[in-house]
C-alpha cells in the first residue's frame, strides 16, 4: 500500500485559514502561521466585544437619560426611582430613545416620576 502524505488535507486546512484572514494587514493574510494566530485572536476579539457592546450601549443609554433627566430637574437615579414608584416599566433603551427623539413624552414621564417622589 502506498504512503499517503496528506497534501490535500493540509492544503485545505491552510486555504481555509488564509480565506478567514483575507483583508488582514501585512503578512497576516499571506503567511499561514501568522494568519492562524491572527484568526485565533480575531475570534477572541469578536467573542469579547460582543459582550463589551452590551455594556457600551447601556452606558450610552444611561448618559442620555441622565442628561435629559437633569433638563427636567431630576438626577438619573431620582428619575429611575420615581418611575419605579409610579410603576412605569420602561427600559433604558426606550427611555434613551424618548430622550433623544420625543422630548415631550420624556418630560411627561419625568413629571410622573416627580409626582411620585413628591417634588
UniProtKB/Swiss-Prot annotation:
Keyword annotations from UniProtKB, A to Z: Ribonucleoprotein, Ribosomal protein, RNA-binding, rRNA-binding
Domain of life of the organism encoding this protein: Bacteria
GO biological process, one term: translation
Annotated GO MF terms: rRNA binding; structural constituent of ribosome
Gene3D superfamilies per record: 6.10.160.10, Ribosomal protein L20 (1.10.1900.20)
Keyword field contains Acetylation: no
Cellular component GO terms, alphabetical: ribonucleoprotein complex; ribosome
InterPro entries, per the entry: Ribosomal_bL20, RIBOSOMAL_L20_CS, Ribosomal_protein_bL20_C
Protein family: Belongs to the bacterial ribosomal protein bL20 family.
Role, per record: Binds directly to 23S ribosomal RNA and is necessary for the in vitro assembly process of the 50S ribosomal subunit. It is not involved in the protein synthesizing functions of that subunit.
Classification via NCBIfam families: rplT_bact
HAMAP family: Ribosomal_bL20 (MF_00382)
Listed PANTHER family: 39S RIBOSOMAL PROTEIN L20
Name of this chain's protein: Large ribosomal subunit protein bL20
Organism expressing this protein natively: Streptococcus pyogenes serotype M1
Amino acid at each position: 500500500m502506498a504512503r499517503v502524505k496528506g497534501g490535500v488535507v493540509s492544503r485545505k486546512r491552510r486555504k481555509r485559514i488564509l480565506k478567514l484572514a483575507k483583508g488582514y494587514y501585512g503578512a497576516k493574510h499571506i503567511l499561514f502561521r501568522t494568519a492562524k494566530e491572527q484568526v485565533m485572536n480575531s475570534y477572541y476579539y469578536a467573542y469579547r466585544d460582543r459582550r463589551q457592546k452590551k455594556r457600551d450601549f447601556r452606558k450610552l443609554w444611561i448618559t442620555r437619560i441622565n442628561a435629559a433627566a437633569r433638563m427636567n430637574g431630576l438626577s438619573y437615579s431620582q428619575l429611575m426611582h420615581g418611575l419605579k414608584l409610579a410603576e412605569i416599566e420602561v427600559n433604558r433603551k426606550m427611555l434613551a430613545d424618548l430622550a433623544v427623539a420625543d422630548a415631550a413624552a420624556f418630560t411627561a414621564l419625568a413629571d410622573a416620576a416627580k409626582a411620585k417622589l413628591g417634588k
